[in-house]
Amino acid sequence: MKAKIVLVHFPFTDLSGSKLRPALVIHEGEQDVIVAFISSEIPSSIQESDLLITKDHPAFRSTGLKISSVIKFDKIATLSKTLIEGEIGKVLPGLADECNTIMHQFFRF
C-alpha cells in the first residue's frame, strides 16, 4: 500500500474532528499506516515540507487526484487501516523520488 493515494478520515491538528480527504501512504505497518495530508488548497508560498503536484505533472493522472494539489509532509498521521475508505491512485517512481527528497530534506533528524 506504500506510495498509494487513499481516502482517509484525516484528523484536524487539534483533534477536534476529522475530514475525509486524500492522503499519501508513506509507510504501511501490520495494522496501521502513516499518511501525509493532501490538500487542493495551494498556498501562495510553497513550504520546504510541501510537494506541489500540478495537473501538468507527468505523473498527475496516476495519482487519482482531480485538481492540482499539495502533499503536506509536515502534516502526517498514523492511522488504523480501518479508516481507509478507498484507494484512488498511486505515486509513480519519479514522483516517489520527489517525495523521498522532500521528506529527507525536511525531517533531517
Describe each PLM feature range.
Residues 16-19, 25-56:
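Compact nucleic-acid interaction/catalytic patches
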